[in-house]
């Protein structure tokens, strides 16, 4: 049985500003020593987006700055144990559940495992990248967050020419294009997700067996026996192109024999 990779436990010290700074510094030090990247200061760190862009145009207008890069996905530690599903959230995560019936998923005559609804861990990614809701639409906000600083627009990661979409400006003309980041709800031309990995127990000779209980030695992972967005992409390591868990030339052959 392949075990689900557990989400990192957020330390309660993260509620304290001083400790957040120290922990961030420690994370940067560790990542420098190991050669690994960090979400801090990356495109998924909405608290650092303003500094990285070199402008003061986004927090307070485009999205809310909650003071911690973790809470845009992870449940704040002061809400540890809370059930986000009771409030319309994705099970185990701090994002609202997308309208899953809206997705057109990949299908094929050769696909044995038909999936109707993405798993929670992939819904987490889609809740931003399908472009249907604001990137800061979290179920819980940190207790330390000042609601008077809430954003005016809560922009969506959507390439459309609408005031509520990032694509209004990020169109490749006024600013860099976000088109590749906006997946939409039609996923028929994307790699299938949330299906059981066919290489388990040598079930299909066209797929490689996993190396260990978490997936493969090169970092490609299996979650609850399934292939998910996070199987190939590692949001916590932005140093690799498009957040891949291994090099692009070796990614496909990690699973596929041909």
Residue ranges and their predicted role:
Residues 2, 33-71, 75-258:
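C-type cytochrome heme-c attachment and multiheme electron-transfer modules
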Residues 4-23:
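Bacterial N-terminal signal peptides that target proteins for export
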Residues 23-31:
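Bacterial N-terminal signal peptides
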């Amino acid at each position: 049985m392949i075990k689900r990779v557990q989400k990192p436990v957020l330390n309660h010290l993260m509620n304290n500003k001083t400790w957040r700074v120290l922990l961030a510094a420690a994370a940067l030090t560790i990542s420098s020593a190991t050669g690994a990247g960090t979400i801090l200061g990356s495109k998924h760190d909405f608290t650092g987006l303003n500094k990285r862009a070199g402008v003061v145009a986004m927090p307070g207008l485009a999205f809310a700055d909650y003071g911690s890069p973790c809470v845009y996905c992870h449940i704040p530690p002061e809400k540890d144990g809370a059930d986000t599903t009771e409030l319309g959230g994705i099970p185990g995560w701090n994002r609202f559940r997308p309208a899953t019936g809206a997705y057109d998923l990949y299908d094929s005559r050769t696909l044995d495992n038909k999936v109707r609804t993405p798993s929670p861990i992939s819904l987490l990614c889609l809740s931003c990248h399908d472009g249907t809701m604001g990137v800061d639409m979290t179920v819980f906000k940190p207790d330390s967050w000042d609601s008077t600083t809430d954003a005016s627009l809560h922009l969506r990661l959507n390439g459309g020419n609408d005031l509520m979409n990032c694509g209004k400006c990020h169109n490749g003309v006024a600013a860099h294009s976000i088109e590749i980041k906006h997946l939409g709800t039609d996923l028929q031309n994307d790699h299938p997700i949330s299906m059981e990995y066919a290489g388990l127990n040598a079930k299909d000779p066209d797929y490689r067996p996993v190396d260990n209980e978490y997936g493969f030695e090169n970092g490609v992972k299996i979650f609850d026996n399934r292939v998910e967005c996070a199987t190939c992409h590692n949001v916590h390591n932005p140093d690799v192109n498009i957040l891949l868990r291994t090099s692009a030339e070796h990614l496909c052959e990690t699973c596929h024999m041909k």
